[in-house]
Design a protein with these regions (language model features):
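Active-site-adjacent beta-strand/loop module that shapes the phosphate/pyrophosphate-binding cleft
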Residues: 83, 92-116, 123
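NUDIX/MutT-family hydrolases
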Residues: 108, 116-151
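Conserved hydrophobic/aromatic beta-strand scaffold that supports enzyme active sites
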Residues: 32, 42, 104-108, 126
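Short secondary-structure junctions
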Residues: 79-86
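Conserved Nudix-box catalytic region and its N-terminal flanking loop in Nudix hydrolases
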Residues: 39-78
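Actinobacteria-biased recognition of intrinsically disordered, low-complexity terminal regions
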Residues: 1-13, 160-162
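Conserved N-terminal beta-strand and adjoining loop/helix that marks the start
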Residues: 8-40, 61, 92
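Generic C-terminal helix-cap and adjacent flexible tail
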Residues: 148-162
Length: 162
């Protein structure tokens, strides 16, 4: 996997950072599920979580002793009820959110089994560029840009705002 840059994307720079400048990075496994028609899955952040209602790619924290792939497999069963096939590590992006500094390990997934079931009360949407759902989580934006590059898409990848 290649990193976009060593410097993290800063989300909401006007807000104070919890934990200060020396806070630990949280390792996160993120699944970019892609259908044969090229549509990709976005889910909304569930009620009660930071950035509630924002749209993102599904995934979650890597637990101690887990690999990114193991965490992704576990998280996608827990969150959306699917068992995934091959995991294709794609890109890494660091994002400095006010509540956490995260290292997002994006993995493409083309095969899965089971019906989508949102176990945390979130919504889901199969999207193409430009995505229609909003608001989009800041850590999701680089992925939309990468898709635009891969797919030779010109124009805005999303619309921000509620």
């Amino acid at each position: 996997m290649s990193a976009r840059s060593a410097k993290p994307l800063v989300a909401h720079p006007d807000r104070p950072r919890q934990g200060g400048p020396d806070r630990a990075e949280v390792e996160v496994a993120v699944g970019v599920l892609i259908r044969p028609d090229g549509a990709f899955l976005l889910t909304s952040r569930p009620p009660g979580k930071v950035y509630e209602g924002y749209w993102e790619f599904p995934g979650g924290k890597v637990e101690p002793g887990e690999s990114v792939e193991q965490a992704l497999r576990r998280e996608l069963v827990e969150e959306i009820g699917v068992v995934i096939g091959a995991v294709h590590p794609w890109r890494v992006e660091r994002v400095d959110y006010p509540h956490a500094l995260v290292r997002l390990n994006f993995c493409k997934v083309f095969e899965w089994s089971g019906e989508l079931h949102m176990h945390e009360g979130q919504s889901f949407a199969w999207e193409m560029l430009p995505v229609q759902v909003r608001p989009v989580l800041p850590g999701t934006v680089p992925v939309l840009d990468w898709f635009a590059q891969e797919r030779s898409f010109e124009g805005p990848t999303h619309t921000q705002g509620a």
